[in-house]
């Protein structure tokens, strides 16, 4: 007769799971702005997702934290100055975040180069991209123009997703949310890292003092598509 009370006491002594962080409350108006931006641009993202058979909600969730940051830190004058420096001198002199998805020129260069090694490289040609993976002043100018265009940023995002699928095709994901958190970390930390490094990075709070992949998952699980 003592077994049941003993088990109950043992259960009470177990540490409670930490409560889920409410990122909507933490980021306030920046969170709301990011949600509204995605709703207003649903058509663009959904068009590409349908065209290339990609999960639209995951694409949105991957860049959602960057939209929060964009609304909080965007400085038009600084970005214009850095764009000029990148075009004239290259990524080693100016590797800045640009556009709603806060993509860096070095990221765009890497995506272009890696996509050319896969069948999805054809997507860039179909989109009319010029000077792809070319590190000349003309090539960098074209790249900046693409990064400043929302439709082209969405295409970069789609290419990134397919590159991650290819690179980590041997990894088994427990659920779409598990895959989302891994790919979101790839976006934040860099998909060029090893799988072990990405998994380690996924546990860290280094995005506005919070966890990038957790913010992505919060949007994915709590906001309507």
Show which residues each predicted segment covers:
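Sec-dependent N-terminal signal peptides
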Residues: 3-12
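Catalytic glycan-binding domains that act on GlcNAc-containing polysaccharides
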Residues: 14-225
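N-terminal cationic amphipathic segment used for targeting or macromolecule association
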Residues: 1-2, 47
